[in-house]
């Protein structure tokens, strides 16, 4: 288990999972304390700003980066919830919202969407696959991460800021491909198309910029996987 902590925006916690996954033999690993929603960024630094806090985007970014780099799961935290902030209790680290209300913050809701996405496909088959991303993939806070099922039945690619990326679709072993955009903010799925074509393809997410992260699913259309977040 690793602790990527609360030092800065865009800290690539996937690097910890990537390191652990490369060990032999690979064992389960996860981020036991990623950036907490509503936590002041870098609260342990002398020049900390009480205004600059991690939001739902920060928590989503940490979840997808870690999971697609090989983590076996993920944890979520909220600065107001862990200390059960309520009237009469002294706030720690500038907590400012009652813990009951913080249970319904956007990041908390979106962690459920993360879970539903990965549980809608055989999650344990996923293997990190940076090699399927071609060319100069976006770096820094816009980093793109990808993982592919060991049997080639599906792949999941996360563009942290909606930047375009190019994929080698030959890693998907299928007669016909289905491609889906998944909105990690609201859990909506948008069927891009089904195709018989292979080879390299560049994808441009529907929106871009900080907070405009998108997930692309490329899969074997004949597997009959449900749309992520669809009613069971």
Write out the residue ranges for each language-model feature.
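Aromatic- and carboxylate-lined catalytic core of secreted/periplasmic carbohydrate-active enzymes
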Residues: 25, 37-39, 55-193, 206-232
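Substrate-binding/catalytic cleft of secreted carbohydrate-active enzymes
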Residues: 1-64
């Amino acid at each position: 288990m690793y602790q990527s902590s609360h030092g800065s925006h865009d800290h690539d916690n996937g690097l910890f999972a990537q390191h652990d996954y490369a060990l032999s033999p690979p064992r389960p690993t996860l981020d036991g304390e990623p950036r907490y929603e509503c936590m002041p960024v870098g609260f342990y630094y002398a020049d900390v700003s009480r205004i600059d806090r991690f939001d739902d985007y920060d928590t989503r970014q940490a979840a997808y980066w870690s999971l697609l780099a090989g983590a076996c799961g993920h944890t979520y935290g909220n600065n107001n919830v862990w200390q059960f902030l309520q009237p009469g209790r002294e706030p720690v680290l500038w907590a400012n919202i009652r813990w009951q209300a913080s249970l319904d913050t956007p990041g908390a809701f979106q962690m459920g969407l993360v879970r539903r996405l990965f549980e809608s496909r055989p999650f344990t088959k996923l293997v990190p696959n940076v090699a399927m991303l071609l060319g100069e993939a976006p770096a820094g806070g816009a980093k793109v991460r990808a993982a592919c099922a060991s049997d080639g039945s599906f792949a999941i690619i996360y563009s942290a800021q909606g930047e375009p990326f190019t994929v080698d679709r030959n890693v998907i072993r299928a007669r016909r491909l289905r491609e889906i955009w998944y909105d990690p903010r609201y859990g909506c799925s948008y069927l891009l198309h089904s195709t018989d074509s292979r080879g390299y393809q560049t994808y441009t997410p529907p929106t871009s910029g900080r907070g405009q992260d998108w997930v692309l699913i490329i899969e074997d259309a004949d597997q009959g996987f449900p749309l992520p977040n669809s009613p069971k």
